[in-house]
């Protein structure tokens, strides 16, 4: 019969083993470590973590049904990560399930700090947000915050990149936090505002979700990059996220993924590219898409591949922030 001491030892060892990445045990799809910058976590415990799916991509009913039937808990996500050789990744707060209630993400990232690096969602114009960012950086070791939305109907500006959000941006700049941006709608004005914010807040590393949604039909010669996308290459604090969702868009346009990634790498540099699976959101065979992402890097140097799939993300997403920028 197992005594309490033996049970506790077994439980502890099991927890430690579960928290370790697959690089120590199983197969890998690439001969280098992977860092997933775009993982969404949610659970089917609405009594403890209430849903707010009012802005879900496919509607609240479908989102809640999906979360209840197929929760994206650490157990589920880690199993997938281990299958493909992902060492760690960003837990990106999922607007479709919890909006700005980051409770679940912060609870699981506290439990698994070596595998989940939290990126929260907060109201960019709320006066409480600057203080909340400082508190979360210190207490919860967040690496950044994510802002998304459509432009204002009257001004055409994205409010999270205006003076209305100055407090949040200033706090992130002081703390050295990442701001992940996913503007929705017309990309020309959005990318202009991104350039302005990059200049104004040089200690904020801006990460563009889905590389700012290149318009492959509008600008086929530049693989969808508009002049406003291209000019961002001169801003060294802007980074670009190559994701499963973006890969779907590229494939739908009948553009070879390899050609697309090579062009993006040529424009922005591998040291400014990161990669993410979009697990929890994209409804595709993810293991196949991970392999396709890796294969699309064929022809790049090993150093470039490591940068895109691990090194850049590890340098950019710093738990707790990088701190204030020091100038000599």
Task: Please place each PLM-identified region on the residue numbering.
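Mid-to-C-terminal alpha-helical segments outside catalytic/metal-binding sites
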Residues: 4-20, 28-37, 46-83, 87-88, ...
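Mid-domain alpha/beta scaffold segments of enzyme catalytic cores
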Residues: 28-167, 175
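Conserved, mostly hydrophobic/aromatic
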Residues: 38, 81, 105, 172, ...
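A cross-domain feature marking catalytic cores of carbohydrate-active enzymes
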Residues: 39-41, 93-94, 120-124, 146-149, ...
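Active-site environment of divalent metal-dependent phosphoester hydrolases
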Residues: 42-45, 96-99, 125-128, 152-154, ...
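Short aromatic-enriched loop/helix-cap "lid" or pocket-rim segments at secondary-structure transitions
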Residues: 46-50, 103, 131-133, 194, ...
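Short, electropositive alpha-helical surface patch
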Residues: 103-115, 198-204, 259-266, 291-298
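Catalytic pocket-lining loop regions of alpha/beta-barrel enzymes
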Residues: 143, 158-275, 323-327
